[in-house]
Amino acid sequence: MTITRPKLFSIPSGTAFLPAFAKALLEGRLIEGFPGDASDPLALANATIYVPTRRAARALRSILVDMNPAKSAILPTIRPLGDVDEDAAFFNAATSGVFDLNPPIGKAERLLLLARLIRPWRESLPAHVRALFGVDDVSVPATTSDAIWLARDLAGLMDQVETDNAKWSELASIAPDDLADWWQVTLGFLDIVTKLWPEILEERKLSNPAAHRNELIWGEVRRLRDHPPQGPVIAAGSTGSIPATAELVSVIARLPQGAVVLPGLDRDLDEGAWNLLGASDDNPSTFGHPQYGLHKLLQAIGVLREDVEHIEDMSVNKRVLERVVSQALRPAETTDAWSELIDDPNMQPQALLQSAQKIDLIETANEREEALAVALALRDAISDENKTAALVTADRNLARRVVGELARFGIDADDSGGRHLRDIETATLMRLMVETVFNPGDPVALLALVKHPMLRLGGKRIERRLAAETLELVAFRGGTGRASIIDLPAFFDRRMEESASQSWQ
């Protein structure tokens, strides 16, 4: 492969990433001479674009079609990073190594096999390790469900270690001396992963999912490096958080027709603070910084921050906000630089107020009010049919509440986090039925079951709803006693008699 100068771009964090990327691509700002005539339906056909997720791939396809003057085109190949097409190996001699990979083990099979190894673990502890517990018995795992719970965590740890290309052998030396004895308990437990589990995988001719994904990505790296494709190859939106992905991005940046578009590289952080991000992996203020991953990626590619071209299409106010966020998130060791902002005209109170005039703070009394406030803001934002709105939150409970509040307004929100099977209506009905049977007398579960929208009881919905409200008011509010499904009619009659005999003032 001919070594070329890496081509890297960045789209500011205050700009919608995919629309800005699509616009730059169609305008020919990423790959010289590509796509040529953007109105040609075949102009994009021979390009390959890697994006972080399947959702991003679907969104980019829609955006490219919308931006095409003819509203139709043969789209480029758009792949999620880490989701390498194994079937393509059948038609490409350069990826013959893919045939030698063992297929990944299924999630359920892995959990059950790990649980079977964990279940007898406490019986295999050496005497000197058991002595650490004193008179207490080693009670973990106590049940099969405990073993499955531990298996789930152990599987997650395996995926994390293999994703980061870490070595299990390094675990033995990381504990301080005063914890070394207790650390042996942990190491003994991890023998399940380091000694027993590889034997099971070898016996079954299977591999761990993370290791299998890494091997596929490394195969793609070798293919691109040894046999560069004829068309453009672009990686968009990746931070290279996975070592294998970082290497793939690095190779793409050096392809003759390759380019990498980064999301929100900080161009305002001073050199001292920027270099601090790569000085140590042990400082929480550095590896927890939002730019830490991008700093490592640029190091892996072998370029400086100044070599990255910024695709800028921002208003003055958004540019000021970008600087404010950069200053607010600078590493703690460099916050003394804030004193220098006093002479910066863009950082004066009036300028900051003007740039933040569209930012609102809403304080609510509880989670329901919070979700309702967000839903109202989203509803107001999309009242203009030419606008879109999004809620970005790591709080899944808040997201579900907002989706529910929007449904009251007849708005079907697209929740990218999806829904657990246990949370769909049919599953909640089944869960409530089981709970009322195995936990008789719980009025909350019983009322939730009676009020469930999928519970019909052979009548009309409005009639069932009125009956449920009557049951709640007469039988459960202000009274005592516990009722199960079996004795609910007798319990209701008794509560009616008690209510009739009370003297009302």
Where are these regions (language model features)?
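Polyanion-engaging groove/track-forming segments
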Residues: 1-505
